[in-house]
Every structure is written in structure tokens, then in C-alpha cells.
């Protein structure tokens, strides 16, 4: 339903503003709506990070956006080769790398004092100069009915870690994310792990 409504709204937006081109990234359902709207209005579509294989519903969305796109900026040689095998003209496929790596390389080595609170951190304030583990668990979109068992396995493995700080990133908003969020709140509210910090994204 969200995708359908987004197509309607984006079609109106593009009709009003007539952009020279539209840039979309990866495999989010909202980007599929953008891609469909732009394509049917004959607006050139540029896709970042096509050709990646995940084995989930996201992969179907990503490949659908690829087939609607006119120009492709891929992150890896493997992705480039995959798009060409899918029938894309190699003259329209450019190996540019992953934009997120560029962002990470520009990250500040010294964080501001209020970084934790400003970025919606919850729990103990981490000491970034010490060793820490980053944990992130998103629901598997094609098997979201198994989310509870999967997050419990991740939590059970994580609670055994006591001698190192853990920074846990909140899940995305895909189907099953509410189950993950609820289990993380149980840990947080009951203070079951004193060495953990949470970041909501």
C-alpha cells in the first residue's frame, strides 16, 4: 500500500518539477516507487549499488530498479559484471564504489562530547577509544515470521560477552522490526547487560 501511494505522489511531484534526472540508491521499497514514477514519465533514472545479491525481497526490488534505470553506478566489479549479464548495456554501467565508504572515511576521529545523546544513544555512554563490538540485527523480510527466534539467538549469544563494550544499532522498519525492538527494550529496561549501548537510527 505504501509503495502504491508513493507512486501516485511521486508522479505528481515529477510532473510538477520535471527534473533532468532522478537518482535512487539500493533496494528500498520507496525507491522502487520513485523508479516506477520516473520511468513512466520518461525521466532518466540513475541507480546506485545495483547488481548486489542478498537472497531477500530486497534483491527483487534492487533488480527491478535496475531494469527501470538508464545509468548504473555500481559498488563492485562483481556487481558490474552481474548487471551486464542481466542485459544492461556495459556503456551505461560505471564502477564507482560504495558511497557509504566515502562517508565513513570522512568520519571524525574525535567525536564531540554530546555525540551519544545527540544521536539518540540509550544506555551507558561508550568509550570509543576502548575496544567494542557493533551489533545490528534486521528482520529477514522473506522470513519475518521467524524474527523472534532469530533475535533471541542473537541476544543469547551477545549476553555471553562481558569483557568488551557492545554498541547495538536499532533495526530498520521492515516487517518484523517491532519484534526486534521489543526484545531490545527488554534488555535495556531490565538492565540485563551493563556493557551495552543502543543507537536508534
Which role fits each region the language model picked out?
Residues 1, 112-201:
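Donor-nucleotide binding loops and adjacent catalytic segments primarily
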Residues 1-90, 97-98:
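Active-site and donor-binding regions of nucleotide-sugar-utilizing enzymes
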Residues 9, 82, 103, 153-157:
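Alpha-helical scaffold segments in soluble metabolic enzymes
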Residues 19-22, 46-50, 69-71, 107-112, ...:
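Short linear motifs at secondary-structure transitions and domain/linker junctions
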Residues 23, 46, 73, 94, ...:
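Hydrophobic/aromatic beta-strand patches that form the interior of the parallel beta-sheet core
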Residues 55, 100-103, 176:
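Generic structural signal for helix capping and beta-alpha/helix-loop junctions
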Residues 61-63, 108-109, 182-184:
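Short low-complexity, flexible loop/linker segments enriched in glycine and/or proline
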Residues 69-147:
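A nucleotide-sugar donor-handling region in carbohydrate enzymes
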Amino acid at each position: 500500500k505504501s509503495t502504491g501511494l508513493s507512486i501516485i505522489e511521486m508522479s505528481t511531484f515529477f510532473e510538477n518539477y520535471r527534473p533532468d534526472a532522478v537518482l535512487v540508491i539500493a533496494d528500498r521499497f520507496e525507491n522502487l516507487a520513485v523508479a516506477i514514477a520516473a520511468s513512466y514519465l520518461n525521466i532518466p533514472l540513475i541507480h546506485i549499488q545495483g547488481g548486489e545479491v542478498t537472497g531477500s525481497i530486497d534483491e527483487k526490488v534492487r533488480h527491478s530498479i535496475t531494469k527501470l534505470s538508464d545509468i548504473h553506478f555500481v559498488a563492485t566489479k562483481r556487481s558490474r559484471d552481474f548487471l551486464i549479464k542481466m542485459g544492461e548495456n556495459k556503456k551505461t554501467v560505471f564502477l564507482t564504489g560504495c558511497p557509504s565508504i566515502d562517508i565513513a572515511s570522512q568520519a571524525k576521529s574525535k567525536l564531540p562530547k554530546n555525540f551519544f545523546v545527540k544521536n539518540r544513544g540509550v544506555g551507558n555512554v561508550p568509550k570509543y577509544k576502548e575496544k567494542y563490538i557493533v551489533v545490528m540485527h534486521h528482520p529477514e523480510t522473506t522470513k519475518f515470521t521467524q524474527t523472534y527466534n532469530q533475535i533471541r539467538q542473537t541476544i543469547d549469544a551477545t549476553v555471553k560477552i562481558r569483557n568488551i563494550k557492545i554498541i547495538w544499532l536499532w533495526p530498520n522498519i521492515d516487517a518484523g522490526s517491532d519484534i526486534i525492538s521489543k526484545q531490545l527494550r527488554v534488555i535495556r529496561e531490565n538492565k540485563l547487560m551493563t556493557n551495552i549501548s543502543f543507537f536508534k537510527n
